[in-house]
């Protein structure tokens, strides 16, 4: 008796805050292996793969469709859960590893996979996330004011709703709110 569960979220937050205060040292990188790798998406998978590949000596470029890197870490997690400064510090650390980040590039439209291989990339990692919601097919789900979790969080986080009333967010809020599912 007398034992309590560990609060993983609080521990992760402590470590992130500590690293933010103390600064992250850029490790020695592996010997260059002369292989270019393109990473599609700058969410958790893309950032992690990019950092690991850079540490192994690969030349890495991230292609991000949005105007800022971070993917779901940026648009899907509210400021009170993941302060943007922590994400910005992590992205800067990855840049210090030599990773290049190109934003506003939609792979498949702006540039194709064949274009990437023609540019000398030996491999492509697709960390594109799960951006498409699953709808239930219920009457009214296509009406104004009905949002998927990702759409709602994107509008909140990318349109600065957390800085309300300085910024007004184009989200229709009704008197009644229904939340279906427990993911986001």
Go through each PLM region and give its residues:
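Residues forming the flavin
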Residues: 12-184
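Iron-sulfur (Fe-S) cluster-binding segments and ferredoxin-like electron-carrier domains
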Residues: 1-17
